[in-house]
């Protein structure tokens, strides 16, 4: 699978959208400031108006995946990332890189066998370390950046330079090849094995803890489940299409 045809589109989005402030948030802040200065002046008796409704919790989206699964990469780059760009203010993402791997305890040390070989195990650990060491948004964007590329391991440095320049690729690789990487992968194995119902394939997507059978419906489901009074404009027009998965 070649990912280069979407690189220009993705790179532009990655550079522009993380810096955007959701319009709803900007509008509410400016409105509050305006109302505060015009309706309640000094020395006036200011009555309390209606209390604002508590903010609705974001929709929780959890992705259980493996780094070299083509279907996982497609979902991450073409579905999850664009959905986050469009409705980031109403969703919360959790990534669990492990997928269809298996673990065993050998003389007190955890060893892993991955569906797509040793490289996938190493990349799973790299992404687990990114999630462990970076701020959540920076980790997500760095992983998306890597997953879009053909040679993911070599793209760790360039992607970090864009989204977490204060973190060296050497520190991430030290984590991935050391005890911390093994521990993180074991924790991801436990999270994956504890799924109920168990995952049938990857990408395995949970939305508010419930399996999403058709990953292409992610944007639609997030919009439907969000209970806030104001939703992003994109929620009014959505199209779905079927996607393939990688079975065990």
Curated annotation (Swiss-Prot):
Residues of the signal peptide: 1-26
Disulfide linkage: 69-72
Molecular function per GO: disulfide oxidoreductase activity; oxidoreductase activity, acting on a sulfur group of donors; oxidoreductase activity, acting on a sulfur group of donors, disulfide as acceptor
Keywords associated with the record: Disulfide bond, Glycoprotein, Immunity, Lysosome, Oxidoreductase, Redox-active center, Secreted, Signal
Residues cleaved off as propeptide: 27-54, 231-248
UniProt key word Nucleotide-binding: no
Free-text description of this protein's post-translational modifications in UniProt: N-glycosylated. Sugar chains contain mannose-6-phosphate.
Glycosylation site list: 92, 105
Compartments where found: Secreted; Lysosome
One GO-annotated biological process of the protein: protein stabilization
Pfam family, one: GILT
Reported consequences of knocking out the gene: Mice lacking GILT are deficient in generating major histocompatibility complex class-II-restricted CD4(+) T-cell responses to protein antigens that contain disulfide bonds. Mice are partially protected from Listeria monocytogenes infection, they exhibit reduced bacterial replication in spleen and liver. Bacterial escape from the phagosome is impaired in the macrophages of these mice.
GO CC terms, sorted: cell junction; cytosol; extracellular region; lysosome
EC number: 1.8.-.-
Family: Belongs to the GILT family.
Assembly mode: Dimer; disulfide-linked.
Function: Lysosomal thiol reductase that can reduce protein disulfide bonds. May facilitate the complete unfolding of proteins destined for lysosomal degradation. Plays an important role in antigen processing. Facilitates the generation of MHC class II-restricted epitodes from disulfide bond-containing antigen by the endocytic reduction of disulfide bonds. Also facilitates MHC class I-restricted recognition of exogenous antigens containing disulfide bonds by CD8+ T-cells or crosspresentation.
Other comments on record: Both precursor form and mature form have thiol reductase activity.
Protein name: Gamma-interferon-inducible lysosomal thiol reductase
Naturally occurring in which organism (per UniProt): Mus musculus
